[in-house]
Amino acid sequence: MASAALIDSDMEPTLQPILDQKTLRWIFVGGKGGVGKTTTSCSLAIQLAKHRKSVLLISTDPAHNLSDAFNQKFGKDARLINGFDNLSAMEIDPNGSIQDLLAGGGESGEDAMAGLGGMGNMMQDLAFSIPGVDEAMSFAEVLKQVKSMSYEVIIFDTAPTGHTLRFLQFPTVMEKALSKVSQLSRQFGPMLNSFLGGGGRLPNGQNIDELVEKMEALRGTISEVNGQFKDADLTTFVCVCIPEFLSLYETERMIQELNSYEIDTHSIVVNQLLFPKQDNPCEQCNARRKMQKKYLEQIEELYDEFNVVKMPLLVEEVRGKEKLEK
Protein backbone atom coordinates (compact mmCIF):
# COMPACT_ATOMS: atom_id res chain seq x y z
CA MET A 1 0.00 0.00 0.00
CA ALA A 2 2.22 2.73 -1.35
CA SER A 3 0.12 5.62 -0.05
CA ALA A 4 0.63 4.40 3.50
CA ALA A 5 4.34 3.88 3.16
CA LEU A 6 6.72 5.94 5.24
CA ILE A 7 10.30 6.21 4.10
CA ASP A 8 13.38 6.34 6.27
CA SER A 9 14.10 9.96 5.34
CA ASP A 10 10.94 10.94 7.25
CA MET A 11 12.72 10.00 10.47
CA GLU A 12 15.50 12.57 10.19
CA PRO A 13 14.44 14.99 12.99
CA THR A 14 15.98 14.09 16.36
CA LEU A 15 16.27 15.54 19.87
CA GLN A 16 19.74 16.87 18.99
CA PRO A 17 18.59 20.50 19.48
CA ILE A 18 17.94 19.70 23.15
CA LEU A 19 21.41 18.18 23.49
CA ASP A 20 22.90 21.28 21.87
CA GLN A 21 21.04 23.75 24.10
CA LYS A 22 23.63 24.04 26.86
CA THR A 23 21.54 26.45 28.95
CA LEU A 24 18.83 23.86 29.70
CA ARG A 25 18.59 22.90 33.36
CA TRP A 26 15.15 21.26 33.55
CA ILE A 27 13.69 18.82 30.98
CA PHE A 28 10.26 17.24 31.42
CA VAL A 29 9.20 14.16 29.43
CA GLY A 30 5.48 13.40 29.49
CA GLY A 31 2.42 12.05 27.71
CA LYS A 32 -0.35 9.47 27.88
CA GLY A 33 0.34 6.22 29.72
CA GLY A 34 2.02 3.48 27.68
CA VAL A 35 3.45 5.64 24.89
CA GLY A 36 7.12 5.24 25.81
CA LYS A 37 7.82 8.15 28.17
CA THR A 38 10.28 6.24 30.33
CA THR A 39 12.18 4.82 27.36
CA THR A 40 12.41 8.31 25.85
CA SER A 41 13.53 9.96 29.09
CA CYS A 42 16.12 7.26 29.79
CA SER A 43 17.54 7.45 26.26
CA LEU A 44 17.65 11.25 26.43
CA ALA A 45 19.39 11.11 29.82
CA ILE A 46 22.07 8.78 28.43
CA GLN A 47 22.73 11.09 25.49
CA LEU A 48 22.83 14.14 27.76
CA ALA A 49 25.38 12.38 29.97
CA LYS A 50 27.73 12.45 26.96
CA HIS A 51 27.45 16.24 26.77
CA ARG A 52 27.02 17.37 30.40
CA LYS A 53 29.11 17.02 33.55
CA SER A 54 26.28 15.73 35.75
CA VAL A 55 22.76 14.54 34.91
CA LEU A 56 19.91 13.52 37.24
CA LEU A 57 16.91 11.48 36.04
CA ILE A 58 13.88 11.67 38.35
CA SER A 59 10.71 9.58 38.11
CA THR A 60 7.61 11.27 39.52
CA ASP A 61 5.28 8.54 38.24
CA PRO A 62 3.80 6.50 41.16
CA ALA A 63 4.20 3.42 38.91
CA HIS A 64 7.97 3.81 38.67
CA ASN A 65 9.69 2.18 35.68
CA LEU A 66 13.26 3.48 35.89
CA SER A 67 14.38 0.44 37.87
CA ASP A 68 12.95 -1.87 35.20
CA ALA A 69 14.41 0.16 32.34
CA PHE A 70 17.97 0.05 33.70
CA ASN A 71 17.69 -3.34 35.45
CA GLN A 72 18.77 -1.58 38.65
CA LYS A 73 16.89 -0.71 41.84
CA PHE A 74 16.33 3.00 42.55
CA GLY A 75 14.67 4.75 45.48
CA LYS A 76 14.01 8.21 46.89
CA ASP A 77 17.73 9.00 47.09
CA ALA A 78 19.77 9.72 43.95
CA ARG A 79 21.99 6.80 42.92
CA LEU A 80 24.52 6.49 40.11
CA ILE A 81 23.33 4.32 37.23
CA ASN A 82 25.59 1.34 36.57
CA GLY A 83 28.11 2.11 33.86
CA PHE A 84 28.04 5.89 34.41
CA ASP A 85 29.96 8.26 36.63
CA ASN A 86 27.86 11.34 35.82
CA LEU A 87 24.29 10.00 35.46
CA SER A 88 22.12 9.36 38.52
CA ALA A 89 18.48 8.38 39.00
CA MET A 90 15.85 8.48 41.73
CA GLU A 91 12.18 7.56 42.17
CA ILE A 92 9.93 9.78 44.29
CA ASP A 93 7.14 8.39 46.49
CA PRO A 94 4.48 11.14 46.71
CA ASN A 95 2.69 9.58 49.67
CA GLY A 96 5.93 9.33 51.59
CA SER A 97 6.73 12.95 50.75
CA ILE A 98 3.59 14.41 52.30
CA GLN A 99 4.05 12.34 55.46
CA ASP A 100 7.65 13.53 55.79
CA LEU A 101 6.50 17.11 55.40
CA LEU A 102 3.82 16.75 58.08
CA ALA A 103 6.29 15.18 60.49
CA GLY A 104 9.16 17.49 59.70
CA GLY A 105 11.48 14.49 59.60
CA GLY A 106 11.94 11.64 62.08
CA GLU A 107 8.55 10.15 62.85
CA SER A 108 5.81 9.66 60.31
CA GLY A 109 3.24 12.35 59.61
CA GLU A 110 0.50 10.17 61.03
CA ASP A 111 2.32 9.88 64.37
CA ALA A 112 2.93 13.63 64.46
CA MET A 113 -0.72 14.52 63.91
CA ALA A 114 -1.93 11.75 66.22
CA GLY A 115 -0.88 13.93 69.16
CA LEU A 116 -3.82 16.20 68.35
CA GLY A 117 -6.37 13.41 68.72
CA GLY A 118 -9.51 13.88 66.62
CA MET A 119 -8.41 17.35 65.52
CA GLY A 120 -5.14 15.94 64.20
CA ASN A 121 -6.97 13.29 62.21
CA MET A 122 -9.22 15.95 60.71
CA MET A 123 -6.25 18.11 59.66
CA GLN A 124 -4.46 15.12 58.16
CA ASP A 125 -7.57 14.09 56.22
CA LEU A 126 -7.86 17.66 54.98
CA ALA A 127 -4.26 17.71 53.78
CA PHE A 128 -4.70 14.47 51.84
CA SER A 129 -8.05 15.54 50.37
CA ILE A 130 -6.81 18.73 48.69
CA PRO A 131 -6.90 18.00 44.93
CA GLY A 132 -3.44 17.34 43.55
CA VAL A 133 -1.73 17.35 46.93
CA ASP A 134 0.13 14.08 46.28
CA GLU A 135 1.68 15.52 43.11
CA ALA A 136 2.38 18.78 44.93
CA MET A 137 4.18 17.11 47.80
CA SER A 138 6.12 14.95 45.37
CA PHE A 139 7.18 18.13 43.62
CA ALA A 140 8.14 19.70 46.94
CA GLU A 141 10.30 16.74 47.88
CA VAL A 142 11.99 16.79 44.49
CA LEU A 143 12.80 20.47 44.82
CA LYS A 144 14.06 20.06 48.36
CA GLN A 145 16.47 17.33 47.32
CA VAL A 146 17.49 19.04 44.10
CA LYS A 147 18.20 22.24 46.03
CA SER A 148 20.88 20.47 48.05
CA MET A 149 22.44 18.68 45.08
CA SER A 150 24.57 19.89 42.19
CA TYR A 151 23.43 18.66 38.79
CA GLU A 152 23.93 20.46 35.51
CA VAL A 153 20.66 19.19 34.04
CA ILE A 154 17.66 17.38 35.54
CA ILE A 155 15.21 15.22 33.56
CA PHE A 156 11.75 14.40 34.89
CA ASP A 157 10.15 11.13 33.77
CA THR A 158 6.62 12.24 34.59
CA ALA A 159 3.35 10.46 35.34
CA PRO A 160 0.56 10.18 32.71
CA THR A 161 -0.89 13.47 31.46
CA GLY A 162 -3.48 14.19 34.16
CA HIS A 163 -1.01 13.66 37.00
CA THR A 164 1.64 15.70 35.22
CA LEU A 165 -0.65 18.69 34.73
CA ARG A 166 -1.50 18.65 38.44
CA PHE A 167 2.19 18.19 39.19
CA LEU A 168 2.93 21.44 37.35
CA GLN A 169 0.19 23.28 39.27
CA PHE A 170 2.11 22.97 42.51
CA PRO A 171 2.26 26.69 43.43
CA THR A 172 -1.54 27.02 43.20
CA VAL A 173 -2.09 23.87 45.26
CA MET A 174 0.39 25.06 47.87
CA GLU A 175 -1.44 28.39 48.20
CA LYS A 176 -4.73 26.55 48.74
CA ALA A 177 -3.20 24.21 51.31
CA LEU A 178 -1.63 27.07 53.27
CA SER A 179 -4.88 28.99 53.15
CA LYS A 180 -6.77 26.01 54.61
CA VAL A 181 -4.19 25.52 57.38
CA SER A 182 -4.27 29.23 58.28
CA GLN A 183 -8.06 29.20 58.31
CA LEU A 184 -8.11 26.20 60.63
CA SER A 185 -5.53 27.77 62.91
CA ARG A 186 -7.67 30.89 63.32
CA GLN A 187 -10.94 29.02 63.65
CA PHE A 188 -9.80 26.33 66.05
CA GLY A 189 -6.90 28.15 67.74
CA PRO A 190 -8.23 28.00 71.31
CA MET A 191 -9.28 24.38 70.89
CA LEU A 192 -5.87 23.43 69.47
CA ASN A 193 -4.07 25.12 72.35
CA SER A 194 -6.07 23.09 74.84
CA PHE A 195 -4.97 19.90 73.07
CA LEU A 196 -1.32 20.89 72.73
CA GLY A 197 -0.38 21.31 76.38
CA GLY A 198 2.67 23.16 77.72
CA GLY A 199 4.70 25.20 75.25
CA GLY A 200 2.16 24.64 72.48
CA ARG A 201 3.96 21.50 71.30
CA LEU A 202 2.85 18.04 70.26
CA PRO A 203 4.04 15.05 72.32
CA ASN A 204 6.83 14.43 69.81
CA GLY A 205 8.05 18.05 70.01
CA GLN A 206 6.41 19.15 66.75
CA ASN A 207 4.60 22.51 66.72
CA ILE A 208 1.81 23.57 64.37
CA ASP A 209 3.42 26.99 63.87
CA GLU A 210 6.67 25.26 62.93
CA LEU A 211 4.79 23.16 60.40
CA VAL A 212 3.32 26.28 58.82
CA GLU A 213 6.74 27.97 58.80
CA LYS A 214 8.25 24.98 57.00
CA MET A 215 5.49 25.07 54.42
CA GLU A 216 6.08 28.80 53.91
CA ALA A 217 9.82 28.21 53.46
CA LEU A 218 9.04 25.45 51.00
CA ARG A 219 6.79 27.82 49.10
CA GLY A 220 9.73 30.22 48.77
CA THR A 221 11.79 27.48 47.15
CA ILE A 222 8.89 26.62 44.86
CA SER A 223 8.55 30.24 43.78
CA GLU A 224 12.24 30.44 42.89
CA VAL A 225 12.32 27.25 40.84
CA ASN A 226 8.94 27.94 39.28
CA GLY A 227 10.43 31.10 37.81
CA GLN A 228 13.09 28.96 36.15
CA PHE A 229 10.42 26.62 34.77
CA LYS A 230 8.90 29.54 32.85
CA ASP A 231 12.26 30.45 31.31
CA ALA A 232 12.60 28.80 27.87
CA ASP A 233 16.39 29.03 28.11
CA LEU A 234 16.34 26.85 31.23
CA THR A 235 13.32 24.58 30.80
CA THR A 236 11.56 22.57 28.08
CA PHE A 237 8.90 19.86 27.93
CA VAL A 238 9.21 16.91 25.52
CA CYS A 239 5.80 15.48 24.59
CA VAL A 240 5.68 11.74 23.83
CA CYS A 241 2.80 10.13 21.93
CA ILE A 242 1.82 7.38 19.51
CA PRO A 243 -0.09 7.93 16.22
CA GLU A 244 -3.56 7.16 17.62
CA PHE A 245 -6.58 9.35 18.36
CA LEU A 246 -6.54 9.26 22.18
CA SER A 247 -2.81 9.90 22.36
CA LEU A 248 -3.05 12.80 19.91
CA TYR A 249 -5.99 14.23 21.86
CA GLU A 250 -4.06 14.11 25.15
CA THR A 251 -0.98 15.61 23.50
CA GLU A 252 -3.00 18.59 22.28
CA ARG A 253 -4.58 19.00 25.70
CA MET A 254 -1.18 18.87 27.36
CA ILE A 255 0.38 21.40 24.98
CA GLN A 256 -2.51 23.82 25.58
CA GLU A 257 -2.05 23.46 29.35
CA LEU A 258 1.72 23.89 29.10
CA ASN A 259 1.17 27.10 27.16
CA SER A 260 -1.14 28.35 29.91
CA TYR A 261 1.59 27.56 32.46
CA GLU A 262 4.12 29.41 30.26
CA ILE A 263 6.31 26.29 29.98
CA ASP A 264 8.25 25.90 26.73
CA THR A 265 7.52 22.91 24.53
CA HIS A 266 8.75 22.51 20.96
CA SER A 267 9.56 18.78 20.65
CA ILE A 268 7.21 15.83 20.10
CA VAL A 269 8.39 12.21 19.99
CA VAL A 270 6.05 9.90 18.05
CA ASN A 271 6.72 6.29 19.05
CA GLN A 272 5.70 2.85 17.73
CA LEU A 273 5.61 3.74 14.03
CA LEU A 274 5.33 0.86 11.55
CA PHE A 275 7.40 0.90 8.37
CA PRO A 276 6.80 -1.27 5.28
CA LYS A 277 8.88 -4.33 4.47
CA GLN A 278 8.86 -5.30 0.80
CA ASP A 279 9.44 -9.01 1.39
CA ASN A 280 6.90 -9.35 4.20
CA PRO A 281 3.41 -8.17 3.14
CA CYS A 282 0.98 -8.07 6.06
CA GLU A 283 -2.66 -6.99 5.72
CA GLN A 284 -2.95 -5.95 9.37
CA CYS A 285 0.36 -4.08 9.20
CA ASN A 286 -0.75 -2.22 6.08
CA ALA A 287 -4.06 -1.26 7.71
CA ARG A 288 -2.29 -0.02 10.81
CA ARG A 289 0.27 1.92 8.77
CA LYS A 290 -2.59 3.63 6.95
CA MET A 291 -4.16 4.63 10.28
CA GLN A 292 -0.81 5.83 11.62
CA LYS A 293 -0.18 7.86 8.48
CA LYS A 294 -3.47 9.71 8.97
CA TYR A 295 -2.65 10.72 12.54
CA LEU A 296 0.98 11.45 11.70
CA GLU A 297 -0.18 13.89 9.03
CA GLN A 298 -2.46 15.53 11.59
CA ILE A 299 0.45 15.86 14.02
CA GLU A 300 2.64 17.45 11.36
CA GLU A 301 -0.15 19.83 10.36
CA LEU A 302 -1.04 20.83 13.93
CA TYR A 303 2.56 21.20 15.07
CA ASP A 304 4.34 22.42 11.96
CA GLU A 305 6.62 24.62 14.09
CA PHE A 306 7.56 21.74 16.41
CA ASN A 307 10.46 19.35 16.09
CA VAL A 308 8.58 16.07 15.45
CA VAL A 309 10.77 13.02 16.10
CA LYS A 310 9.53 9.73 14.59
CA MET A 311 10.56 6.45 16.20
CA PRO A 312 9.83 2.95 14.82
CA LEU A 313 8.09 0.11 16.63
CA LEU A 314 10.88 -2.22 17.76
CA VAL A 315 10.75 -6.01 17.75
CA GLU A 316 12.04 -6.35 21.32
CA GLU A 317 11.86 -4.58 24.66
CA VAL A 318 14.16 -1.62 25.24
CA ARG A 319 15.78 -2.45 28.58
CA GLY A 320 19.31 -2.03 29.83
CA LYS A 321 22.00 0.55 29.15
CA GLU A 322 23.06 -0.78 25.73
CA LYS A 323 19.56 -0.85 24.18
CA LEU A 324 18.55 2.49 25.68
CA GLU A 325 21.71 4.08 24.31
CA LYS A 326 20.83 2.98 20.76
From Swiss-Prot:
Cellular component annotations (GO), alphabetically ordered: GET complex
Broad EC category: hydrolase
Gene3D superfamilies xref list: P-loop containing nucleotide triphosphate hydrolases
Keyword check for Chaperone: no
Assembly and interaction partners: Homodimer.
NCBIfam families reported in the protein's UniProt record: GET3_arsA_TRC40
Family: Belongs to the arsA ATPase family.
Protein name: ATPase GET3
